[in-house]
């Protein structure tokens, strides 16, 4: 039986504006990664935001396929574009 993880998600900039929150808690299945969390965010908030983000897990830049652990803090950092 898989365990449920509590992941704190922190939003910045455009993502925070779209969602209307600066953070929230997601309950995820053990073995999930940031890509899975992003899919849950898109579904819950009915938004299409792409994947143009850097991510940090527990204040360390990370990869999208890293396995998350209970209590992790996941931050989505929008990439700045312009010229």
Where are these regions (language model features)?
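Ubiquitin-like/PB1-type beta-grasp interaction modules and other compact soluble beta-rich domains
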Residues: 1-82
């Amino acid at each position: 039986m898989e365990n449920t993880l509590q992941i704190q998600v922190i939003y910045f900039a455009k993502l925070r504006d779209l969602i209307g929150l600066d953070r929230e808690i997601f309950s995820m299945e053990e073995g999930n990664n940031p890509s899975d969390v992003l899919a849950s965010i898109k579904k819950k908030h009915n938004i299409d935001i792409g994947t143009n983000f850097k991510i940090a897990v527990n204040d360390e830049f990370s990869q999208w396929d890293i396995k998350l652990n209970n209590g992790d803090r996941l931050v989505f950092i929008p990439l700045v574009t312009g010229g």
